Swiss-Prot record:
This is Coiled-coil domain-containing protein 172. InterPro entries: CCDC172. It is found in: Cytoplasm; Cell projection, Cilium. Residues 13-90, 123-191, 226-256 form a coiled coil. GO terms for cellular component: cytoplasm; sperm midpiece. Keywords: Cell projection, Coiled coil, Cytoplasm. Its main location: cytoplasm. May interact with TEKT2. Belongs to the CCDC172 family.
Length: 258
């Protein structure tokens, strides 16, 4: 081998060695990058694992909470069913008590009405209550007018105005209530008037009974005869006797009707 060939071989060998060292550096650099990637991937994996474990824990907690909610929902449904049944029982009891109270109230009102009719105090009480209601209505109207005047003079004060308006509304409501009561009393008064008219008709009927009496008819016939004969004095005497007889019979019929 010549010296030149040896020199070229040495240069080629050094070149290969340099190439090998370059490749080694690239391999080491690549290994370092791969290790960094592996480390980063491992860290990310650990983070994801921690997140996953946290999510799993949250899932178990939510599952447990959901079971608790379902158990609570079942308990509430059971309680609602019990409350509904109890409410239905209470409603039935209330309806029965309400019906009994209405019956007792009707019975009491009937007894009071019978008592008032027996002792003739209903009409007096109604008249007195009617007068009282009218007086109260008049007082309330006066108070309402006074409040209206006060409200006009106190419009600058909002709080006082609102209070007066509230009082006015209450007074108007009470006035409507009393007017309804007055209407009830007027209806009762009309009923009493109808009863009075009926009694007056009975009285007229009783007063007409003497027309069917034999003695009364006889005297009337005599009266007609005397009237035809222009016997005025006898006619007047018989007329007086007939009126006295009618009055006596009417009083007798009234005593019998009592």
């Amino acid at each position: 081998m010549s010296l030149e060939s040896l020199f070229q071989h040495i240069i080629f060998t050094e070149h290969q060695a340099e190439e090998s060292r370059r490749l080694m550096r690239e391999v080491r650099s690549e290994i370092t990058r791969c290790r960094e990637k592996i480390k980063k991937a491992t860290e990310e994996l650990n983070e994801e694992k921690i997140k996953l474990e946290s999510k799993v824990q949250q899932f178990f907690e939510k599952s447990f909470f959901l079971q608790l909610l379902k158990a609570h929902e079942n308990a509430l449904e059971k309680q609602y069913s019990e409350i509904t049944n109890h409410r239905n029982m209470l409603l039935q009891t209330f309806e029965a008590i309400k019906k009994q109270m209405i019956e007792e109230e009707d019975k009491f009102i009937k007894e009071i009405t019978d008592f008032n009719n027996d002792y003739e105090i209903t009409k007096k009480r109604e008249l007195l209550m009617k007068e009282n209601v009218k007086i109260e209505i008049s007082d309330l109207e006066n108070q309402a007018n006074m409040l209206k005047s006060e409200m006009k003079s106190m419009e600058h004060d909002s709080s006082q105005l609102n209070e007066l308006q509230k009082q006015k509304s209450e007074l108007i409501q009470e006035l409507f209530t009393l007017q309804r009561k007055l209407k009830v009393f007027e209806d009762e008064e009309n009923e009493s008037i109808c009863t009075t008219k009926y009694l007056e008709a009975e009285k007229i009927k009783i007063s007409e009974k003497p027309q069917n009496d034999t003695e009364c008819l006889r005297l009337k016939k005599e009266l007609e005869l005397y009237k035809e004969d222009d016997m005025e004095s006898v006619y007047e005497a018989l007329q007086t006797e007939i009126e006295f007889l009618e009055l006596t019979l009417a009083q007798k019929d009234l005593q019998e009707s009592k």
